[in-house]
Amino acid sequence: MASGKTTGKTDAPAPVIKLGGPKPPKVGSSGNASWFQALKAKKLNSPPPKFEGSGVPDNENLKLSQQHGYWRRQARYKPGKGGRKSVPDAWYFYYTGTGPAADLNWGYSQDGIVWVSAKGADTKSRSNQGTRDPDKFDQYPLRFSDGGPDGNFRWDFIPINRGRSGRSTAASSAASSRAPSRDGSRGRRSGAEDDLIARAAKIIQDQQKKGSRITKAKADEMAHRRYCKRTIPPGYKVDQVFGPRTKCKEGNFGDDKMNEEGIKDGRVTAMLNLVPSSHACLFGSRVTPKLQPDGLHLRFEFTTVVSRDDPQFDNYVKICDQCVDGVGTRPKDDEPRPKSRPNSRPATRTSSPAPRQQPQKKEKKSKKQDDEVDKALTSDEERNNAQLEFDDEPKVINWGESALGENEL
């Protein structure tokens, strides 16, 4: 069956917005770029790179038999007086059967091509890894566990454990013949905080500190693209992007605090752990199409189940209680509370009257018994009891380690 390319506008998803980091170089047409960052020659007219090890970048997602490909030279220029000026070449890695030299078999001699393979790789096979679309995916950091290129080349260091939407700014550094191993990069992942909301807020803050900031024009584009593809930029309220919060119909998630703070509210990032991905929504939902006068309406019904055994079950229930049909309300810990009295000032029943407590229905005590209990309290116990009546409830919720997966945010 013959197939042809469609022309004109498509209904493809909007490009992913990258919050920080260097803009990936585009090699050839869109969607034909290397998955990895470039090797950069230190001088003009440097010879092709030679590697201490196999020369294949580390990629744990591939089997050993698929670890082969080629490095391709890319001439670079920069504008100068009287025209463009040559700068040292860049070399990009592609798997065999992909990229600009996709039609070449492994080992075919050609100027500007260096073939590499890991020990045990099947160089007769062709990769199905494809190439990268720079508008949707960032470059993957280069790592060589068995030895990198010779001293004529360098590459920008990018942390290997960065999140996709939180790229750190690449700091240019001279590359030694052996780069940090993957085990070392795993070790840097172990310092996670226990509080899920605090972790979520920290991720957002780090994204804003590292790399380039979102421009006003980019933020406006994020907030006003097609409704189903919108995301809330930093500094925007929820209702600026998705309209006013409602009750008992679409748009009913979010209380007043969440609406005002937008993505700064850690509960947003926490609940995103339960929101289906695009693929899960499409293939795991009950999809109901309906033709209306204004167009085709698609309804997606999806259920996420949080087990009662989940350590974060109570926390998710609490957020839902606060935010579902939450318009016009605020969390209790966000409301102003009476200030605690300092411990240095002794509090007594006469100087610091405590609010009257409701008597328990199950235990009925006579007034005489109550008087005897009061007399039995020491002065320190009286002071502590009075103080506790005015203490604020703790605002920090211990979410635990298991609430947040390594790649969920």
Swiss-Prot record:
One of its GO terms (cellular component) is host cell endoplasmic reticulum-Golgi intermediate compartment. Residues 15-31, 164-179 have a biased composition (Low complexity). CDD domains: CoV_N-CTD, CoV_N-NTD. The keyword Ribonucleoprotein applies. It holds the Pfam family CoV_nucleocap. Residues 226-333 are annotated as: Dimerization. It comes from the Viruses. GO terms for molecular function: RNA binding. The modification Phosphoserine is found at residues 190, 379. InterPro entries: N_prot_C_CoV (IPR044344), N_prot_N_CoV (IPR044345), NCAP_gCoV (IPR042547), Nucleocap_CoV (IPR001218), Nucleocapsid_C (IPR037179), Nucleocapsid_N (IPR037195). Belongs to the gammacoronavirus nucleocapsid protein family. This is Nucleoprotein. It comes from Avian infectious bronchitis virus (strain D1466) (IBV).
